[in-house]
């Protein structure tokens, strides 16, 4: 049964109906690989949403970074508000992997900081995959890393049903075995408490509490309740409480794992002794024996993931089970921006193994640590059954899987044509660019400029700034959150020009950009290859007056192919518009605060130095501000404010001031609603 309910204020048009029909036919007929070659701004996400809705398959959408994953997740949640659209990325705010540098004899211990909200979203994704069919998971490449054993995770779930009799002591023990901790004072995710005949659990995948009310040994009621006020939110007939961690190891398997680790240790020590590596042997023996003692006593140790092969009972060299293994058999894989995502996917294993080999060779880890790894590319494709590659510039590998066939989508619903390409000589290019920027600035339009080196970008930024141009410089050292802010400021008109080395960022959605300038376009290389040029030119493809300026003294083969492809698309688009009487119109798109930006901004932004409006909100003077015309400054600071109010709400609840906590909760709810309306 197809439970997907697609909601959109418009119907497929342009090339979308044809692309949707062909993709659906391919999926239903069992085609293993298909490629959608969709030009920038043609509505590829909406096309994929329709394919998912019509095929009714659970879907994994793979993006090559968490920012794009968040953008996709937001869009799909708007299309499928009644279905489960989940977000699965690495839950580390900060991660420094364990490493050893032999040249300087430097050991670097693993350090990491886990984002609890993202961890909750990851658990929500796996819970949804177990409990329903209408599930779309938008994930980053982190989904190819080990994620426990799905069968053990499901088997370990503690089930409760109204009317059933339970042994409370056994249920509490099961929760502890599933890595929940008892705390009768403060309950949060991964904790539970028991008061009289009421058991309350903070599940790993919810921000609500599960309250189980008992009458003797019989379950009288099961409810979702607000963790701060105790307000009943929903009544249930039954509920499954999944483990607090994805890695679940039964007692019998832990015992056999300890035995296997001990045997492997003996073999490796004998090997080191034979090779005369006495220091390495001592180092390995000391560390591993300590880890074994910790595993025996508490079932956990630092770096426990390095023993994952033994704890999972896998054979040497076999692939780990990951998010993909939580999907049912008939799932659908969608690889977004496949020309970037596929190479990234194929490179993950080799990079991981190079680091692990050094640790193993120098006695920091057992050889089995090498099996705590991402999937190899061939293992990944063996697990996937049907795949849709999505890109404006598909790579050769993807096209080879489809035997060179692809489905094209070049008509934009807005009727906007691909940018006009204007090739100009490099002599006097900076003065020429400055005059073009001033023309756009007067029209309240934006400009992107891409250079070949950081030094050139810095010098150009300084020159433009000295000439009274509002300009910013985007480079690799800027944190991803600051990058989001810079892009939002460009759209808001805080400045007119963005300069960078590599602005071809796939998925960068900037409808206000009318001019893209590519300096040194005739210098062959990665940044001026055909695909890079097409992607960069495409940044101006959402504007009615879109133009791409290529400064070059020669026509390279890459330039010729990129110009030819752009002209071909313009011809098709222009003809379609003439036949159908379509006048190009701007692609108006609201400025978004993505899931990712909201999560990280709410955690990281300084809550000090709030604006007057925000001070009024903290002082409970919210109604006038919330009902007033949108204040962008307020919107920008809102995630920080929500974080501040949540802390005040928790403090009020701890002090048993539930009336104040409820009042703060309602204000936070208003703020979240305002934020969602304007994103």
From Swiss-Prot:
It holds the Pfam family UVR. Residues 639-674 form the UVR domain. Keywords: ATP-binding, Cytoplasm, DNA damage, DNA excision, DNA repair, Excision nuclease, Nucleotide-binding, SOS response. Residues 429-583 form the Helicase C-terminal domain. GO terms for cellular component: cytoplasm; excinuclease repair complex. A motif (Beta-hairpin) lies at residues 91-114. SUPFAM superfamilies: C-terminal UvrC-binding domain of UvrB, P-loop containing nucleoside triphosphate hydrolases. The beta-hairpin motif is involved in DNA binding. The UvrABC repair system catalyzes the recognition and processing of DNA lesions. A damage recognition complex composed of 2 UvrA and 2 UvrB subunits scans DNA for abnormalities. Upon binding of the UvrA(2)B(2) complex to a putative damaged site, the DNA wraps around one UvrB monomer. DNA wrap is dependent on ATP binding by UvrB and probably causes local melting of the DNA helix, facilitating insertion of UvrB beta-hairpin between the DNA strands. Then UvrB probes one DNA strand for the presence of a lesion. This is UvrABC system protein B. It comes from Prochlorococcus marinus subsp. pastoris (strain CCMP1986 / NIES-2087 / MED4). The gene is uvrB.
